[in-house]
Amino acid sequence: MITDPKMLELLVCPITGGTLSLNRKTQELISLEAKLAYPIRDGVPIMLASEARPLQNNGKELHKK
């Protein structure tokens, strides 16, 4: 799990270069701009477009906590 806020600030979406937000529930880094969720496995963010899943409902799923 990414616990250091500084690390999250350094990471950007590999497709858009935009900011990412952390979804602790799903263990994913979210790019609203690209509408993709990048998985975090064993504490390591997998920043490959081929590993990302498309967000459903334009990211509205993120607001259901």
Curated annotation (Swiss-Prot):
Belongs to the UPF0434 family. Coiled coil: none annotated. This is UPF0434 protein BH12860. HAMAP family: UPF0434. InterPro entries: Trm112-like (IPR005651). The lineage of its organism: Bacteria, Pseudomonadati, Pseudomonadota, Alphaproteobacteria, Hyphomicrobiales. GO terms for cellular component: cytosol. It comes from the Bacteria. Disulfide bonds: none annotated. Gene3D superfamilies: 2.20.25.10.
